[in-house]
């Protein structure tokens, strides 16, 4: 009699231990923050390191309007904003507070808006020199679930998820169960 292997014997951990990318600058940042995460007791460095491992989809961009909104919070006005990802411009805002923003990259419009307000744009390795323990910083993340693809995930009855279809219109995906005139409507 043998043993029934009812579950997978070698379970892969879903967590990344290194970035998938071959970007040498990213690898240098990983090396730097691996050292800081090990040698300092600050959880900030561990958070930044884990964020550096993420895929581009899981590192959505942060707009300058989101940064401006975050800085309006109580006690956040003079903190350094940290974004492990891209900082993008927002044409809808004209007033931007003077602040220091550290990020992986900036779009030209976002950089211009931050500098014009009297702030500065720094890289994450410059941040490590200024705040090795992440003191006086504010970490921001972009919206992960704003992608169009997320509308289709978890399809099923009563989930309100969008079906994957090529044609859209009044009668597409609106038959039995979706219209009163076709049997019933949920």
Swiss-Prot record:
What is the predominant subcellular site recorded for this chain? cytoplasm
The record's Gene Ontology biological-process terms are:
cytoplasmic translation
Q: What does this protein do?
A: Component of the ribosome, a large ribonucleoprotein complex responsible for the synthesis of proteins in the cell. The small ribosomal subunit (SSU) binds messenger RNAs (mRNAs) and translates the encoded message by selecting cognate aminoacyl-transfer RNA (tRNA) molecules. The large subunit (LSU) contains the ribosomal catalytic site termed the peptidyl transferase center (PTC), which catalyzes the formation of peptide bonds, thereby polymerizing the amino acids delivered by tRNAs into a polypeptide chain.
The record's annotation in InterPro entries points to: Ribosomal_eL18, Ribosomal_eL18/eL18-A/B/_CS, Ribosomal_uL15/eL18, Ribosomal_uL15/eL18_sf
Task: List residues of cross-link (Glycyl lysine isopeptide (Lys-Gly) (interchain with G-Cter in ubiquitin)).
Answer: 116
What taxonomic lineage is listed for the species of origin? Answer: Eukaryota, Fungi, Dikarya, Ascomycota, Saccharomycotina
The molecular function GO annotations come to: RNA binding; structural constituent of ribosome
Keyword DNA-binding present in the record's keywords: the answer is no
Whose protein is this, by species?
Saccharomyces cerevisiae (strain ATCC 204508 / S288c) (Baker's yeast)
Q: What is this protein called?
A: Large ribosomal subunit protein eL18A
Q: Which UniProt keywords apply?
A: Cytoplasm, Isopeptide bond, Methylation, Ribonucleoprotein, Ribosomal protein, Ubl conjugation
As for family, the record states: Belongs to the eukaryotic ribosomal protein eL18 family.
Q: Does the keyword DNA-binding apply?
A: no
Subunit organization = Component of the large ribosomal subunit (LSU). Mature yeast ribosomes consist of a small (40S) and a large (60S) subunit. The 40S small subunit contains 1 molecule of ribosomal RNA (18S rRNA) and 33 different proteins (encoded by 57 genes). The large 60S subunit contains 3 rRNA molecules (25S, 5.8S and 5S rRNA) and 46 different proteins (encoded by 81 genes). eL18 interacts with NAP1.
Q: Where in the cell is it found?
A: Cytoplasm
For the modification N6,N6,N6-trimethyllysine, the affected residues are: 50
Gene symbol? RPL18A
GO cellular component entries: cytosol; cytosolic large ribosomal subunit
